[in-house]
Amino acid sequence: MGSKIFLLLGLSIAFAILISSEVAARELAETAAKTEGYNNGGGYHNGGGGYNNGGGYHNGGGGYNNGGGYHNGGGGYNNGGGYHNGGGGYNNGGGHHNGGGGYNNGGGHHGGGGSCYHYCHGRCCSAAEAKALEATTAQVKPQN
């Protein structure tokens, strides 16, 4: 009778260890998936960007270098942009269809912009927006 109790106790402990190791492995995998966005981040649908080669297939966010995506892809710092409605980027930005402009070599195939002529808080804007911003930020300098 005593050996059966020890056997059941041993099996219970082994089962508890098995469950806890499964939980620990799952948490470790989730942590690794969260930190994967630093380099070569992104995903298939609504994939977020990343530091280098970030982006995704659909609605992919941009990234620092080579960011962007296939559809509605956000821009990026260098070589940013995307295929359809792709946002621009700092250098070589733009996209194929309705591609947004960029700082250098910006533009796209259809409806794409070009280099910005007017900047408003670090982004391209129209001449009217730039003039309105200039009027609101102009200050009278005191004469000494």
Curated annotation (Swiss-Prot):
One cellular component term (GO) for this entry is: membrane
Compartments, as annotated in UniProt: Membrane
How is this protein positioned relative to the membrane? Single-pass membrane protein
Matching entries from InterPro entries are given as: GRP (IPR010800)
| Superkingdom of the source species | Eukaryota
Q: Name one Pfam family in it.
A: GRP
Q: Which UniProt keywords apply?
A: Membrane, Repeat, Transmembrane, Transmembrane helix
sequence repeat residue intervals: 37-42, 43-48, 50-55, 56-61, 63-68, 69-74, 76-81, 82-87, 89-94, 102-107, 108-113
The membrane-spanning stretches of this chain are 5-25
Where does this protein have coiled-coil stretches?
none
Location of the region described as 11 X 6 AA tandem repeats of G-Y-[NH]-N-G -G in the Swiss-Prot/TrEMBL record: 37-113
**Sequence similarity:** Belongs to the GRP family.
Protein name, as recorded: Glycine-rich protein DC9.1
Provenance organism:
Daucus carota (Wild carrot)
